[in-house]
C-alpha cells in the first residue's frame, strides 16, 4: 500500500542519514573542492563540510576565472585534499584541470537533481544515488 511504501522509504532515508552522520563523525578533514557548480549547501551544512567551488550554487556561469582555478588548485595542494569533485551531467573539464594541476583524482558527487535515462532504467532512486555517494565519499575523502 501507499502508506506502507511511504513508511518503508522514509525508514530507508533515515537509516541513510545515520550512515552519513556515522561516516562524517570519523572524518577529521571535511574539506571538499568542487570544480563545478555547488548545489549542496544544505548537505554541507548538515554534515559540517567545508567546501570551495568553481561556481557559486547553481550558477549559470560557464567558465570560472583563471584566479578561481588557481585558488582552488592552491587550496587542494595546501590542504592535501585528495579529490576534486564534480556533479552529474557536468563535462567536468574544470574539475579535471584542477585535479591534474594538483596531482589528485576526480570523483562524481551525484546531487540527485538530474537522473539519466540509463539511471532510471536501472532503477535509480534518491536512496540508491545517495548510497553511491556515501561509498564514493568513503573512497575519496
Regions found by a protein language model. Give the residues of each.
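Extracytoplasmic metal-acquisition and chelation regions
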Residues: 1-141
Amino acid at each position: 500500500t501507499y502508506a506502507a511504501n511511504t513508511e518503508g522509504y522514509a525508514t530507508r532515508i533515515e537509516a541513510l542519514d545515520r550512515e552519513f552522520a556515522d561516516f562524517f563523525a570519523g572524518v577529521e578533514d571535511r574539506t571538499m573542492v568542487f570544480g563545478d557548480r555547488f548545489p549542496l549547501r544544505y548537505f554541507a551544512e548538515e554534515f559540517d563540510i567545508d567546501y570551495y567551488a568553481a561556481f557559486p550554487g547553481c550558477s549559470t556561469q560557464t567558465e570560472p576565472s583563471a584566479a578561481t582555478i588557481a585558488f582552488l588548485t592552491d587550496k587542494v595542494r595546501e590542504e592535501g585534499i585528495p579529490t576534486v569533485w564534480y556533479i552529474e551531467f557536468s563535462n567536468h573539464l574544470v574539475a579535471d584541470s584542477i585535479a591534474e594541476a594538483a596531482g589528485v583524482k576526480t570523483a562524481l558527487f551525484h546531487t540527485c537533481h538530474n537522473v539519466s535515462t540509463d539511471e532510471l532504467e536501472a532503477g535509480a532512486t534518491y536512496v540508491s544515488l545517495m548510497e553511491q555517494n556515501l561509498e564514493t565519499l568513503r573512497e575519496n575523502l
